[in-house]
């Protein structure tokens, strides 16, 4: 099939003017999906002629039937018929309603004849948009390879009938909508046209809210909120970007968890996780959704085999289902989770021709497993859903109640907000609803990740954003001059990042002030730099490999590597500050400042609007060995590796390497801090040897091998997403914590509680964690262990919360209120573990963590996990600890208590003393 650009050129070849009949008032056309494109657009941006493809056939739609019998439009009509005919020489059939068209075509040498019915022998069929008897025949004709030229307007038709939902009831739309083109009841302006040399843009917004409000009301009938509080899942946020797509459940930040859409003659509902198909509280909504998708047909409801729980929920509401592994030919509705890209075209045609699709999927796990690959572009679910106007993002949402849109109250939508942003940027005034611009930025950046090449619906948005952002200089966010997120300047930061990463010309994105880390100031090396990168990864997840190079902001670099490495799933990353700040109220830096992409070619170009240290991302279990990677456009940054870098080399680096960020590395930990801080460090060796002792202790308590298979990372940043520090890969901290990381004397005297707390968080395992109770508790076991065994700082001095009088008071308050596991959290929960440690030492913990690592099929709910811990710890110390944990109000099961009764009683149980001396509560 020809590309839209080539098709546009073919349709417009030799067309020099649009001489449309003055008395024929057209209607505006609405274009959706990935195949449709505009041909004639007036000066108000309304599409009046469009084209598309469906199956093996093609479609041209004109917005008034009189255009098809206008002799002055003969050049265009001949082009249209020629482009539509896939079989050269095949005759053109013309419906009797357009009989004059047959004469126009015959007069130009085209074989055309009046045919009351469409026939397979025809190459093209021409008809008006009001025929109600040939709908299915016309769709099948086009799908098999025929060309369809159709014209009409819907505004007059709408005025004459009772049904106001033109998009879904107008006869022409029952045919053209399968290819993504709709007649609307909006009148088209004909006061001025120009013949475009290149394909015009599709407008961002065509008003059709009234057509969708009835659908929304039907889906949400009897439902005031969508509550998934106890669903035990984190759904993906949905990006609702289609003109006929609409959100159904939103959080307080306008994050969407469930959405629906019309597409062609069919319907789609998407949830951000398949687990939502099993949530009892969503039962009424699930019933509404399936009934809406069925569209009154009372047809066959097919449920994918893996989702049989949904079948049970629907049965309670009186809906019978058929459990099948795949879509069946007689299905009316198909409920499934898309796990591969198999059958995407079949499913899209199923919807276009009237089927209902109920999809549940999350993309964050896929994104975690595929760093550097956008789920908007490659996640199997999105290959199916993107044309419908709903995409599944890698951003997760917290489980909770989600509000539903209410009649008469405006609801956030990407397209309507983008249209308002366009108006504000043009006039430099105006406002939108609270929170909408803060949402527009990340939504726009996500939308720009959808591959747009030769897809006019996406290309039009790219062109619009490039035009808007090139008019103004980009704001520069700093701590001294923060940018408010929920305003145009905040939206610009996210949108600019998205544009840069989508391949737009960076010369269009000029900051208000050139900072000292951009390419005009940090002059990249004129000659390429080659670094040897260790591409072995014995770990169970991907890892970053440092290069010691920094990429200035807006600098385009060229990366070269051997042919064999280009097929090894390596990725490149610019920047280490991975925190997503899109929900921050103020921005001290851009909300997203890294860029990743696949190194799937021997030579690749990449840029990052904000600059950053350069990394090669190596997949798990890689055994590629050392790979030479050559970078053109980088500058060197300070990088010290314990055991490799000499003190003389380090002194030279901090004097000569201009990169503004540098790294201190051992085989077990890598610290990323500003170069300005590193210049105060004459000799990093003693500091890093201490850090290695810390990491050895962390590994020892966690029963991990040492040296670690992969080093942990700690990165300082001007702003992070949550807290003072937070765990993850990397651990993130504020700039104020840098001295705590790199001042050896300070570490030895005051300790290292914050960083080790986060290292402990990274050690936590769900098998022996009891969230939310122990989330901020068990990680502190590592703090106590490191401070006492490595730094020689007793627990009571390491943290005031562990001063003995404070600890005793905390236990008495807990018991005084009546011990209850609901109140057993954080420091109170830690006390339970410390009492065991003070009685039995650290060895039982180490042996226990080892045992957990070697076990499989462990329980997943808190009660069973807590009882397993009681049993395993009791066996480790050969004491019956059930009474001890019962004193802490753990939910000890009767059979567990009975099974431990043979063990000796723990006479020294400190909780006995507390209970004996506790005042009655």
Curated annotation (Swiss-Prot):
Keyword terms, alphabetized: Cell membrane, Membrane, Transport
Origin superkingdom: Eukaryota
The name this protein goes by in its record: TRPM8 channel-associated factor 1
Main location (coarse class): membrane
Entry similarity comment: Belongs to the TCAF family.
Domain Peptidase M60: 542-841
Subunit and interaction comment: Interacts with TRPM8 (via N-terminus and C-terminus domains); the interaction inhibits TRPM8 channel activity. Interacts with TRPV6.
Molecular function in Gene Ontology: transmembrane transporter binding
Organism: Bos taurus (Bovine)
